[in-house]
């Protein structure tokens, strides 16, 4: 199974709609002059989703040997309107989750 097929399966499972791969977009996000995210965001057309016609998806290295890869999907809903803003939304969610876990 290819990465694209894996991501299509995850989109179907999480969002309940089929997805067709549209394009692969390289994204690099920096903060204070340092690269904090660098990878390929896969863009999918969604078929029948009630709120959007696009999803962004990629694989994320968790750094956890027991669960090394995470499939990430972000729907094209404000503020995630481009591959870059989808990555930014993901990063912000990760920061919020980490802060909540520490509280």
At which residue positions do the language-model features occur?
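Extended non-catalytic interaction/regulatory regions in multidomain proteins
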Residues: 1-22
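Mixed-charge, Lys/Arg-enriched low-complexity segments
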Residues: 4-6, 65-103
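Acidic, low-complexity, intrinsically disordered interaction modules
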Residues: 20-84
């Amino acid at each position: 199974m290819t990465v694209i097929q894996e991501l299509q399966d995850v989109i179907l499972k999480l969002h309940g709609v089929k997805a067709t791969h549209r394009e692969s977009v390289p994204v690099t996000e920096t903060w204070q002059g340092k690269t904090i995210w660098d990878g390929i965001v896969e863009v999918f057309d969604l078929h029948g989703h009630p709120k959007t016609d696009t999803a962004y998806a990629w694989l994320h290295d968790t750094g956890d040997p027991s669960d090394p890869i995470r499939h990430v999907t972000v729907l094209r809903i404000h503020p995630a309107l481009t591959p870059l803003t989808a990555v930014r939304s993901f990063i912000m969610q990760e920061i919020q989750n980490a802060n909540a876990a520490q509280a």
